[in-house]
């Protein structure tokens, strides 16, 4: 058997059960979290002992390591024990011991530090155990030891502290203090050595943007201590899981970021990231108090005397102590020439860095979004013409709600779009944005000018791309009426203060400019001869008559399928309180699939009967023929002709008349007087719609 895989298994991580998949191979044990959180990799040679014991309310596997640490996995089945035992014995030469927990509920026993865990037991039977790495502090008070624990943001209920009462043995008062010995043993394995020992180096007056302040930093082999004016922090090296080094957008500063798990606390606020800010030209000499063994283990990266820019020396120091790689930006460059994109998140300004394997946002709140956690991305308000200079960038996560970054500069759109395509990240409802003159201009934005420019650009595109056969006159007239109604209905649009009506001047007297109606279409069809334009309009009118036929109300009802017959009869049974129409249809489809052929037979017979009924009625309908109506074509023809020259010409927004004018009919008369040439041409073509409209007036 090459490997074993167990999905749905969970691992204990600082009081939180992180679900994932456990894989056993010939040489190692690997656990990967479902949500990209906790991951465990252990080689077979590092395993000291395996125990089969309960974790929570299900069977679990305790993996003891040679260095005294342990990993606990749960969520197995009782039948998995034989599979794991045969696999570990054949590949790792390890047997599994079954360990039963003492579950009588007694609150007294022996508290001992075994390896890197605190085990509380009674008569050599374990009651519970606590990894020393979960301990944040130990306080000794006479005959009482208090353990304070790190907090995990993923856990809803967290253990804050635990107190052990260790009574003094009156017969052996000269023995060493049990509480003090217990404290030293826990601190040694928890990576919380006392500060009495000499630190590796001391960094003074370092600017920290998160949490805000200036701190003196003492770097120890297993921890770092931050001392500020108000707050002090002590961070174990093992809680640092990522290092980032990114430049600021101004090119003069650099951010050095430490990712922490578990985070540090300041009152009720938790900080999962430490962000240090350094000047790019700032230099400082460091003297490192390192032993020869520590220098050798750093592979030549560290020296006792280090000089250079402070951000470089500190990043190299943390890289060697934490044994982690430093993540730097990839090949992405924004419009500023740096990998930083300026934006806001929840009204807090910051910088977004597209990295090789995720997005880093600095700084409030700082976050790192891995590509594995992203479902899709969306560019919002990126196609709104030339009015806006910014757009919103949304990231949809597989687990959790979307993250929105607002007020990104328009120039970053295409660069970010190409970056996502290279990383094969799904983009929904977006496309590249064409650069326009208005977008690159530094002048003040004129909303009216921008709207007219955008409208003209759309009109030019439609004239160039479309052919005569694709043009539909009725649709064009209907669209212009809708545009007119929408522009009249809203009072907040910038066009309202400029819409004056093509037939009236600003004085409201009803006098119209004679050339105003002729100038707009002549600009659009400048190079087109007049006779050709008239023929084209005739062709457009003929093509405009084509459309979808109206449904005859006398036509027979179509046949219903077997599924619809059953669904309509069973709809009340399927519907429950609060169900929508879609929910009921979904339930019906699922139930229909599970039904047997015998159950469906009844409804299939009904469907056949309905089908034969439809065919019979359809023959009678075709034989008699559909009812004809002579009134509809003439009325439609008259209405089309009455639209006259004004409806066949595209009217810009600046020529749309206001519907609130009291003398709507008077401008129409004066318009016909102002353009007698066009009326004569229409009358020569046999159109008498204008005369009818004049008579009606």
From Swiss-Prot:
Where in the sequence does UniProt note compositional bias of the Acidic residues kind? 461-473, 493-502
Identify the SUPFAM superfamilies for this entry. Answer: HMG-box, PH domain-like
Single GO molecular function: nucleosome binding
* Compositionally biased region (Basic and acidic residues): 474-487, 596-623, 666-678
Say yes or no: keyword Lyase present. no
Q: Where in the cell is it found?
A: Nucleus; Chromosome
Q: Name one GO biological process term.
A: regulation of embryonic development
* Regions of compositional bias (Basic residues) in chain numbering: 535-548
Mind naming one GO cellular-component term on file for this protein? nucleus
Task: Report the main location listed first in the record.
Answer: nucleus
Q: Which Pfam families match?
A: HMG_box (PF00505), PH1_SSRP1-like (PF21103), POB3_N (PF17292), Rttp106-like_middle (PF08512), SSrecog (PF03531)
The annotated phenotype of a deletion mutant is: RNAi-mediated knockdown at the L4 larval stage results in less than 10% embryonic lethality in offspring or death at the larval stage. RNAi-mediated knockdown at the L1 larval stage results in sterile animals, which do not seem to produce mature oocytes, but that survive to adulthood. Double RNAi-mediated knockdown at the L4 larval stage with hmg-3 results in 60% embryonic lethality in offsping. Double RNAi-mediated knockdown with hmg-3 in embryos results in defective cell cycle initiation, duration and completion and in failed development of the anterior pharynx.
Q: Where is this region: Disordered?
A: 434-697
Q: Hey, which family's this protein in? A: Belongs to the SSRP1 family.
Indicate the quaternary assembly: Component of the FACT complex, a stable heterodimer of hmg-4 and spt-16. The FACT complex may also include hmg-3 instead of hmg-4.
Its annotated function is as follows: Component of the FACT complex, a general chromatin factor that acts to reorganize nucleosomes. The FACT complex is involved in multiple processes that require DNA as a template such as mRNA elongation, DNA replication and DNA repair. During transcription elongation the FACT complex acts as a histone chaperone that both destabilizes and restores nucleosomal structure.
Return the protein name. Answer: FACT complex subunit SSRP1-A
* The species this protein was found in: Caenorhabditis elegans
Gene of this entry: hmg-4
């Amino acid at each position: 058997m090459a490997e074993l895989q167990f999905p749905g298994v969970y691992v204990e991580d600082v009081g939180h059960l992180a679900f994932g998949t456990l894989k056993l191979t010939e040489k190692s044990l690997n656990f990967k979290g479902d949500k990209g959180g906790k991951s465990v990799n252990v080689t077979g040679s590092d395993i000291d002992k395996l125990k089969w014991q309960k974790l929570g309310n299900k069977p679990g596997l305790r993996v003891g390591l040679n260095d005294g640490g342990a990993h606990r996995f749960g969520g197995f089945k009782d039948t998995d024990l034989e599979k794991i035992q045969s696999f570990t014995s054949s590949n790792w030469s390890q047997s599994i011991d079954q360990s039963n927990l003492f579950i009588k509920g007694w609150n007294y026993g022996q508290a001992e530090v075994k390896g890197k865990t605190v085990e509380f037991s009674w008569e050599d039977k374990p009651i519970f155990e606590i990894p020393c790495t979960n301990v944040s502090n130990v306080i000794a008070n006479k005959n009482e030891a208090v353990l304070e624990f790190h907090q995990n943001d993923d856990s809803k209920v967290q253990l804050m502290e635990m107190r052990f009462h260790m009574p003094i043995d009156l017969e052996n008062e000269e023995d060493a203090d049990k509480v003090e010995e217990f404290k030293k043993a826990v601190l040694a394995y928890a990576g919380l050595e006392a500060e009495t020992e000499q630190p590796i180096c001391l960094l003074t007056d370092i600017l920290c943007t998160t949490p805000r302040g200036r701190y003196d930093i003492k770097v120890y082999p297993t921890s770092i201590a931050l001392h500020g004016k108000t707050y002090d922090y002590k961070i174990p090296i093992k809680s640092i899981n990522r290092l980032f080094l990114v430049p600021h957008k101004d090119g003069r500063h650099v951010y050095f970021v430490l990712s922490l798990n578990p985070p540090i606390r300041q009152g009720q606020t938790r900080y999962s990231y430490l962000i240090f800010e350094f000047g790019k030209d700032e230099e400082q000499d460091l003297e490192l108090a390192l032993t020869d063994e520590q220098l050798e283990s750093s592979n030549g990266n560290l020296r006792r005397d280090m000089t250079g820019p402070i951000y470089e020396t500190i990043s190299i120091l943390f890289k060697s102590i934490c044994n982690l790689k430093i993540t730097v930006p990839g090949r992405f460059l924004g419009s500023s020439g740096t990998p930083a994109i300026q934006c806001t998140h929840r009204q807090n300004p910051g910088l977004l860095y597209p990295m090789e394997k995720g997005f880093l946002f600095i700084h409030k709140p700082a976050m790192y979004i891995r590509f594995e956690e992203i479902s899709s991305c969306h560019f919002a308000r990126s196609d709104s013409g030339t009015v806006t200079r910014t757009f919103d960038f949304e990231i949809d996560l597989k687990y959790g709600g979307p993250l929105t970054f607002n007020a990104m500069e328009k120039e970053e759109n295409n660069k970010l779009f190409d970056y996502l395509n290279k990383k094969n990240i799904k983009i929904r409802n977006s496309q590249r944005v064409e650069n326009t003159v208005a977008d690159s201009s530094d002048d003040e934005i004129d909303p009216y000018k921008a709207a007219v420019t955008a409208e003209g650009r759309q009109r030019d595109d439609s004239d160039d791309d479309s052919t005569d056969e694709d043009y539909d006159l009725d649709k064009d007239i209907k669209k212009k009426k809708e545009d007119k109604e929408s522009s009249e209905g809203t009072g907040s649009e910038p066009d309202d203060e400029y819409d004056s009506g093509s037939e009236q001047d600003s004085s409201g007297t009803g006098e119209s400019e004679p050339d105003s109606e002729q100038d707009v279409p002549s600009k659009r069809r400048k190079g087109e001869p007049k006779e050709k334009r008239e023929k084209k309009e005739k062709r457009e009118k003929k093509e405009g008559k084509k459309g979808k036929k109206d449904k005859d109300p006398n036509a027979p009802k179509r046949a219903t399928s077997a599924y619809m017959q059953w669904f309509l009869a069973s709809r009340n049974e399927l519907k429950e309180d609060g169900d929508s129409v879609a929910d009921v249809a979904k339930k019906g489809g699922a139930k229909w699939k599970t039904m047997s052929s015998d159950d469906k037979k009844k409804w299939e017979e009904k469907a056949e009967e309905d089908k034969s009924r439809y065919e019979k009625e359809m023959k009678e309908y075709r034989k008699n023929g559909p009812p004809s109506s002579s009134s509809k074509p003439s009325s439609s023809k008259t209405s089309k002709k009455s639209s006259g020259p004004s409806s066949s010409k595209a009217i810009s927004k600046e020529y749309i008349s206001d519907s609130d004018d009291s003398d709507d009919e008077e401008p129409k008369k004066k318009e016909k007087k102002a353009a007698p040439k066009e009326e004569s041409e229409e009358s020569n073509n046999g159109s008498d719609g204008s005369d009818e409209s004049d008579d009606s007036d």
